[in-house]
């Protein structure tokens, strides 16, 4: 598993969901976690630097998760940062759109700690983290 000091940004407009993901990450040994409530908030934090991984919801106000993902992939400084989409959008076309936009992984809500751990593990393995 990756460096436990890796800094995560959890992006979701629903504070309860952010807390759930934060707690699951903590269970996996990742305590360096910050939160953002939408894509605009997330971008401001990401541009300030220091993050190594983004876990983002899809449906959010101001800037949705797919737009955030595309913006991250278009930014030279952040383009290689892993982005895991965690969303209620289970439709095949959503999963394809996220993959085409460069998502590192995709988890459909609701999910278990084991599912999150498995997805993170696959991303870390693929990136050699």
From Swiss-Prot:
Q: Does the keyword Protein transport apply?
A: no
Q: Could you give a GO molecular-function term held by this entry? A: metal ion binding
Q: Which cofactor does it need?
A: Mg(2+)
Q: Where in the cell is it found?
A: Cytoplasm
Q: How is the cofactor bound?
A: Binds 1 Mg(2+) ion per subunit.
Q: Which residues form the Response regulatory domain?
A: 7-124
Q: What is this protein called?
A: Chemotaxis protein CheY
Q: What's the source species for this entry?
A: Enterobacter cloacae
């Amino acid at each position: 598993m990756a460096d436990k000091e890796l800094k995560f940004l959890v992006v979701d407009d629903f504070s309860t969901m952010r807390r759930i993901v934060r707690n699951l990450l903590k269970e996996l040994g990742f305590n360096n976690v910050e939160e953002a409530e939408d894509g605009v908030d997330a971008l401001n934090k990401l541009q300030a630097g220091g993050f190594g991984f983004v876990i983002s919801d899809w449906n959010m106000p101001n800037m949705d998760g797919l737009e955030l993902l595309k913006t991250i992939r278009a930014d030279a400084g952040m383009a290689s940062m892993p982005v895991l989409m965690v969303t209620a959008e289970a439709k095949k076309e959503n999963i394809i759109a996220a993959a085409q936009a460069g998502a590192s992984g995709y988890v459909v809500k609701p999910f278990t700690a084991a599912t999150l751990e498995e997805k993170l593990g696959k991303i870390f393995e693929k990136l050699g983290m």
